[in-house]
Curated annotation (Swiss-Prot):
Function: Endonuclease that specifically degrades the RNA of RNA-DNA hybrids.
Binding residues annotated for Mg(2+) 2, in chain numbering: 9, 134
Class in the EC hierarchy, top level: hydrolase
Keyword Magnesium carried by entry: yes
Protein name in UniProt: Ribonuclease H
Organism annotation: Symbiobacterium thermophilum (strain DSM 24528 / JCM 14929 / IAM 14863 / T)
Subunit (UniProt): Monomer.
Cofactor section: Mg(2+)
GO cellular component terms, semicolon-separated: cytoplasm
Details of cofactor binding: Binds 1 Mg(2+) ion per subunit. May bind a second metal ion at a regulatory site, or after substrate binding.
Domain of life according to the entry: Bacteria
Annotated InterPro entries: RNase_H (IPR050092), RNaseH-like_sf (IPR012337), RNaseH_domain (IPR002156), RNaseH_sf (IPR036397), RNaseHI (IPR022892)
């Protein structure tokens, strides 16, 4: 199984507001950068979208180390929030509908073919690839809001 390292980040200008996401995929000596824009969204939605798009970009089942500075994203897997939400019919501990259920379901589908290890990276802590994802996300916002 191919081993891939992925870094992801999401950003929003206002929360909610225009948002962008960025991802860097590393496989051996290969590197791929992805980014995208949404005109009205939240930071958390862009964090999830970055992971979705990065995993969808993989052509084969892979062993993935996915790094994100989003505790929301990483903890959903590492602390089994997603499993609990699914078991409870997508209702959280406060008996409210889980926010971003649509994207969580897309992410689960995108992750299904892969063995994903979800890892937290300190935000803005001089991790080059995480910083690059932030640049990609912010550039997507800038490009999407011009004119």
């Amino acid at each position: 199984m191919r081993e891939v390292i992925i870094y992801t980040d999401g950003a929003c200008s206002g929360n909610p507001g225009p948002g962008g996401w960025g991802a860097v995929l590393l496989y051996g000596s290969h590197r791929k950068e992805l980014s995208g824009f949404h005109p009205h969204t939240t930071n958390n939605r862009m964090e999830i979208q970055a992971a979705i798009e990065a995993l969808r970009a993989l052509k084969y089942p892979c062993k993935v180390k996915l790094y994100s500075d989003s505790a929301y994203l990483v903890n959903a897997f590492r602390q089994n929030w997603l499993r609990t939400w699914q078991r409870n019919g997508w209702v959280n501990s406060r008996k409210q509908p889980v926010e971003n259920q649509d994207l969580w379901q897309e992410l689960l589908e995108a992750a299904r073919p892969h063995q994903v290890e979800w890892l937290k990276v300190q935000g803005h802590a001089d991790v080059a690839e995480n910083n690059r994802c932030d640049e990609l996300a912010r550039a997507a916002i800038a490009a999407g809001t011009q004119g």
